[in-house]
Amino acid sequence: MRKPVGSKDGSGVYSRQGLDGYTPANSNTRISTATLPRPEPLRPAASSANLGLNSDRLRLAMVQRLRQMGITDDRVLDAMAAVPRHTFVDEALASRAYEDAALPIGHSQTISQPWVVARMIAAVCEARAPSRVLEVGAGCGYQAAVLAQFVREVHSIERIRGLYELARANLRALRLSTRVRLIYGDGTQGVPGVAPFDAIVVAAAGLAIPQALLNQLAPGGRLIAPEGSTSQRLVLIERTGTASWKRMELEAVRFVPLKAGIQS
């Protein structure tokens, strides 16, 4: 069992030290939600100890809220209803797992908020049913687990050794390690030996989309990624020819930065 990322000081508040890295600057919480409906907030479980008994109900409530927020792809919604998000975060934060919030997973990284996961996956899957998908930035493994519910071949690359090990343990616990090929490496380079991919999902923001990733899209394939530094937007790119791509800008977001190389 992983150590809790925070500890309560008696007031019910987790310590700043325990939540190191969990700040708006490295959260992928959306900057603006003004255009989205505002459903009733989800009431979290009383404690992580009894969350297992309530997780099915909480996941269904989360999925219903995502539907109210405009996610309509049943493949994505069914997949998110099937994956226990609370098992991908520290026990100290498990009671918040089904809130629409990014949560810290260590190494100054976060698990993406459910709306962002659903939005990004739905966008790249809208035009086709992808059979081979690349995820750049495995993190704790949650998004890869969601993809594995309906995608035949999922490849997920993580540059931080500690997160790679965390994702591997989480996927193994759910018996998904044979359905997700997890790679420790530089995500900006993709996985050229496995390309082309029907879809690529990038879970970190760069100033520009790496050309290596664009080159690894199959014809008609789609890539989605946050782009920018202090001001970021989701960008959806579709490959339309051998050397041509179509680009569309979507919502404002905030993600951790995309970095090259690996971190041991």
UniProtKB/Swiss-Prot annotation:
GO terms for molecular function: protein-L-isoaspartate (D-aspartate) O-methyltransferase activity. The keyword Transferase applies. Catalyzes the methyl esterification of L-isoaspartyl residues in peptides and proteins that result from spontaneous decomposition of normal L-aspartyl and L-asparaginyl residues. It plays a role in the repair and/or degradation of damaged proteins. It comes from Bordetella avium (strain 197N). SUPFAM superfamilies: S-adenosyl-L-methionine-dependent methyltransferases (SSF53335). Keywords: Cytoplasm, Methyltransferase, S-adenosyl-L-methionine, Transferase. One of its GO terms (cellular component) is cytoplasm. The keyword Zinc does not apply. It catalyses: [protein]-L-isoaspartate + S-adenosyl-L-methionine = [protein]-L-isoaspartate alpha-methyl ester + S-adenosyl-L-homocysteine. It is an enzyme of class 2 (transferase). GO terms for biological process: methylation; protein modification process; protein repair. This is Protein-L-isoaspartate O-methyltransferase. It is found in: Cytoplasm. Residues 1-49 are annotated as: Disordered. It holds the Pfam family PCMT. Residues 24-35 have a biased composition (Polar residues). Belongs to the methyltransferase superfamily. L-isoaspartyl/D-aspartyl protein methyltransferase family. InterPro entries: PCMT, SAM-dependent_MTases_sf.
